[in-house]
Structure formats: C-alpha cells, structure tokens
From Swiss-Prot:
It holds the Pfam family DAP_epimerase. The lineage of its organism: Bacteria, Pseudomonadati, Spirochaetota, Spirochaetia, Leptospirales. Catalyzes the stereoinversion of LL-2,6-diaminopimelate (L,L-DAP) to meso-diaminopimelate (meso-DAP), a precursor of L-lysine and an essential component of the bacterial peptidoglycan. The keyword DNA damage does not apply. This is Diaminopimelate epimerase.
Amino acid sequence: MAALKFTKMEGIGNDYIYIDSTQANIRLTPEQIQKISNRNFGIGSDGVIFIRNSKQGDFMMDMYNSDGSSSEMCGNGIRCVAKYIYDHGLTNSKNPKIETGAGVLEVDLKIGSGNKVDFVSVNMGKPILVPSKIPVNWKDEEAIIDQTFEIAGKNLKFTAVSMGNPHCVIFVDDCDQFPVTGIGPLIERHPIFPKRINVEFVTVRGKDHFYQRTWERGAGETLACGTGACAVTVAGNLTGKSGKEVKIDLRGGTLRIQWQESGNVLMTGPAKEIFSGEIEV
C-alpha cells in the first residue's frame, strides 16, 4: 500500500487515528492497525476509525481497537468524526447523522473561532439493560443493578449497561487507589461476558458529580470513554447515586451527560485535531 494519509484526533484524551475513506475504500488488517496504533513504533492511539460513506446516515464511522479488533462505537470517537467531516468540508450541516455499529446517531455541532468545531453533543440513544442484549450470561432477564460477583477474591457490585457496546459499572471508594489495571482485564474477560466488556470504576465526588476510570475492551486503560460515561450516568441514577444530569471527570477531561425524559442519553464534550500526516503500512 502507498503512504496512508491520516489525522490524529482526541476527545478528552481518548485518541484515535482517523482515515478519510469517503473517496477510496481503504481497509487495514488487524496487524496493520496494531502497528500504527503502537505508541512506541507507530503513530500511537487507542485505535483506528475509518470515515466512510453511508446509505443510512450522512457518514459512517468504522472503528477498531488498538489490538485490531472491531468495536461497535466510541462516544469520544464520534465527536471527533463529527468535527472532522465539518472542519474538512465534507459537510456543512451542523446536525449530521453518523452511522455506527450501534445504529445511526444524531450530533449537534458547536462552532467556535475560525469556523471550527469546538464541542459536540451526541444523542447516544437509549441504554440497553436486558442482560442477553448487552450481552451478559445471567440467571434471568431482569436488569442487572448493583449485583454482586466475585473476581480475584473480591466481591464487587456491578451494574450492566449497553450503550451500543457493553459496560460493567462498579462504584468504588477511591478510583485512584483501586487496582484498575489488575482487576480490569480479569473483568473484561470474565466468562459471564461472552463478547468481553468495558469496565468503569467510579467514585462519587459530589451531588451529580462522578470521577471515572475506564478499562476498555481491546485497548486497556484509556484516558476517557464517552459511552462509558453514559453508562455510568444511567447506573448512577438506577442505583440512587445521582439524578439524570451528571458531570463526569475522566483522566483526560470532563463530559456532561443527560439521561433525558425521552429515554435517550445526551453526551456533550470537546473534540480536537492534533496533527495530520502520512505513514507507510
């Protein structure tokens, strides 16, 4: 393959390599994705997102984790896709529809100086709480809210939520003191999660204010996870720890999440372009 043009972008530290595939059907093997995502020998990222044409929406995001595995969707990633298509002149709409592996999502662009996108609000749709649809191998189809399971000798309470991708939300006393990198991969690959799972460790900082660390399926600990923040908001409300409008601090920045009366979850946060370049793959 000739030199591959790319743009690196980040949403509160959740960084991906974005490849404009609207003019050519560009595809990479899992090994190539691993190579360019490597932080020592490649560009360095949490994964790769291809921006493609869509028959269902205005554009499609085709997402892969840094280990080369595919993923349905990324909340921070979709904000960056929205910024890319507007800032690079692929659309002049401030409300484009973007197809993801979790369905077509509507975004609302907040334009700043230089006619560039600063913030993006995304209607993330309704949370899924039915165990078999998350999926979780569970004893019944009742929502899994504050249920206990054992991992590495610890009894942990978790709430299971899908925002188009699966999340296990666990509230702990102090995220920074919790062994996220030790426990996270054990939960990710626990047999009750047949497609593996993203894990959120959450500490209550105040009224409707959480601090979140995320162990992402296929990527390890990341600085942020937008779908995870949405799942945390839902779990916080279902467990009586918060209302439906929540401020969530992550290691890379802050997101505002609202679980609306319609049942949809609205996520608002920044999106930034870091640099563009070419790489041999």
